[in-house]
Amino acid sequence: MKEERLSFIDFAQRVYPFLEFTPFHRTYYAILEAFAEGRIPKLIVSVPPQHGKSVGAATLLPAYMLGLDPDMRIAIASYSGTLASKFNRRVQRIIESREYAELFPETTIKRGTKPTGYIRTSDEVEIIDHKGELISVGREGSLTGNRVDCFILDDLY
């Protein structure tokens, strides 16, 4: 019997229970889930400010995708390195949460100094015992030499 995959909206409700889901959000998260599953190979989202676009695409989506595939390499770029790092830190906090560990026990990151040999900064975090990582960069920054499977561009201007 095939195990049913956790939907993106169910994931979001578990790790961010304070979010409210309007019909717009339900549709938006269904589209993001289709992207995460590869049914939509490339996606551009354009909605007015303060509609939860960044929470969905630059915070929850990378955490969800790393849970589904701990070997995935994801980069987030934004207009400033500071904002991109903020997204990265939010994803790291989700991955550290008890709720996330219950959903995706294979996807873990360095805590404190343990284990050694793994990177964890506000701009880069590696998944323990996997190839996956999350890198963040401002639009003036560089990703040269970094292979990525998913590139999320959020608020470039």
What are the functions of these language-model segments?
Residues 1-41:
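N-terminal accessory segments
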Residues 45-103:
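Conserved P-loop
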Residues 77-140:
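Conserved nucleotide-state-sensing and coupling region of NTP-binding domains
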Residues 42-44, 73-75, 133, 150:
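Residue-level preference for the first positions of well-ordered beta-strands
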Residues 155-156:
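Walker B catalytic acidic pair
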Residues 33-37, 67-70, 144:
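Residue-level signal for alpha-helix termini/capping positions
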Residues 53-54, 138-149:
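SF2 helicase motor core recognition
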